[in-house]
Regions:
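C-terminal catalytic "cap/lid" subdomain
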Residues: 1-137
């Protein structure tokens, strides 16, 4: 934590908390597990008391009805709206759903927190209008 904090405090852009990793348990016995990169990133941002979390994916924004004729890209969405969209099944498990859930967890930490889901390509021209902004209610 101290190393990452030092980089952030010196204006470095820190890219870390990728997937994989080794699961650790208190029992001392091996377990099968996956360290989810989205939730790991959210937890790191929370510990560092960040106000903004950017989660990268393969598309510019999150969408309702993804891949269908009535696909709708979202510029900004709040927590209540996202809960509804999750209940309606708009986000694929193991794909966009964990990204959305991690973003929601981060925004719930503080009403001032903002999460952005976007693509690496769009991040190159990042102007805080890129991607989907997830905000508090």
């Amino acid at each position: 934590q101290a190393s990452i904090r030092a980089l952030v405090d010196n204006d470095f852009i820190v890219i870390c908390a990728g997937g994989g990793g080794i699961p650790v348990t208190e029992s001392g016995q091996g377990v099968e597990a996956v360290i989810d990169k989205d939730f790991a990133s959210e937890k790191l941002a929370e510990v560092l008391e960040a106000e903004e979390l950017i989660i990268l994916t393969g598309v510019s924004k999150i969408a309702l009805n993804y891949g269908k004729d009535n696909e709708q890209w979202l510029d900004q969405v709040n927590l209540t709206e996202l809960e509804q969209y999750i209940q309606e099944g708009h986000f694929a498990p193991g794909s966009m759903l964990p990204k959305v859930q991690a973003a929601m967890d981060f925004v719930q930490v503080s009403k001032n927190n903002v999460a952005i889901i976007t693509s690496l390509e769009d991040l190159a021209d990042f102007d805080h209008e890129t991607g989907t902004r997830i905000i508090s209610d």
